Amino acid sequence: MASLATLAAVQPTTLKGLAGSSIAGTKLHIKPARQSFKLNNVRSGAIVAKYGDKSVYFDLEDIANTTGQWDVYGSDAPSPYNSLQSKFFETFAAPFTKRGLLLKFLILGGGSLLTYVSANAPQDVLPITRGPQQPPKLGPRGKI
C-alpha cells in the first residue's frame, strides 16, 4: 500500500486545456496530494450501562426513577376555566379535531384570502396596462 502512495506522489500530472492559459504558454503541473493511511489504535471494551448503585438496571422499589414520571401532565384538580367557556370550545372546536374538516377549513380560508387580495390589488402595476405616460417623440422626418 505504501508503494501505491509513493508512486502517485512522484508522477506530476498535466491539466489538459490549461497549457495556453498563460502568456508564455507553459504547462501547468500539479502534484497530487499525498495520502497517508494511518492505523488508529482503538481499545475495545465492553460497554456497561449503570443505574444507581451496583449496576441495578431495574428497581422495583423505585419505579418512578426506573420508568420515569408518567403522571406529570395528569391532574385530578378541577378545571380552572369557566364551565360555559369549556362547553363553548368543546362544541365549536370538535369539528376541527378531524384532519379532513381542518383541511377543508384551511382551503376555504386560503381561497377567500386569495380572492380578497386579488380583488383589492391595484390594477395598474405593469407599464403595459398603464399605457404611454408621455407623448411620443417624433422621428427625423416628423413621423412617429
UniProtKB/Swiss-Prot annotation:
Main location: plastid
Transmembrane segments: 104-122
Membrane topology: Single-pass membrane protein
Family annotation (InterPro entries): PSI_PsaH
GO CC terms in record: chloroplast thylakoid membrane; photosystem I reaction center
GO biological process, one term: photosynthesis
Pfam families per record: PSI_PsaH
Keywords, in A-Z order: Chloroplast, Membrane, Photosynthesis, Photosystem I, Plastid, Thylakoid, Transit peptide, Transmembrane, Transmembrane helix
GO molecular function ontology, one term from the record: molecular adaptor activity
Compartment(s): Plastid, Chloroplast thylakoid membrane
Gene3D superfamilies, sorted: 1.20.5.220
Transit peptide, start-end: 1-49
Keyword Chloroplast listed: yes
Similarity-based family: Belongs to the psaH family.
Known function: Possible role could be the docking of the LHC I antenna complex to the core complex.
PANTHER family in the record: PHOTOSYSTEM I REACTION CENTER SUBUNIT VI-2, CHLOROPLASTIC
Record protein name field: Photosystem I reaction center subunit VI, chloroplastic
Organism name: Spinacia oleracea
Organismal lineage: Eukaryota, Viridiplantae, Streptophyta, Embryophyta, Tracheophyta
